[in-house]
From Swiss-Prot:
One of two assembly initiator proteins, it binds directly to the 5'-end of the 23S rRNA, where it nucleates assembly of the 50S subunit. One of the proteins that surrounds the polypeptide exit tunnel on the outside of the subunit. This is Large ribosomal subunit protein uL24. It comes from the Bacteria. The lineage of its organism: Bacteria, Bacillati, Bacillota, Clostridia, Natranaerobiales. InterPro entries: KOW, Rib_uL2_dom2, Ribosomal_uL24, Ribosomal_uL24_CS, Ribosomal_uL24_KOW, Translation_prot_SH3-like_sf. It comes from Natranaerobius thermophilus (strain ATCC BAA-1301 / DSM 18059 / JW/NM-WN-LF).
Amino acid sequence: MPQQKLHVKSGDTVVVISGKDKGKRGKVLRTFPSEQKVLVEGVNMINKHTRATQENPQGGIVEQEGPVYADKVMVYCSKCQKPVRTGAKIDDKGNKSRICKKCGVEL
């Protein structure tokens, strides 16, 4: 199966549109295009049990973000104050940029 391109990039502010974290907003920390998943700051928190090591002699339970499917998030437009769909715009010099489909501002 060919790898599909994601509609979000690292550093984008996104809103979760479905699931247990619906309505939460956060920044994309990392993308996994082959799995169609993204890691969003403060969303889908999971408890990871860590073994005691020399760096962390105590060990214990660490709370961290888990990946969510990319189709469950939408890019957040700061001007519209809403999650929006994105479009592409090519300027005179041939540079491609992403724009908000509602208000037309560059994201």
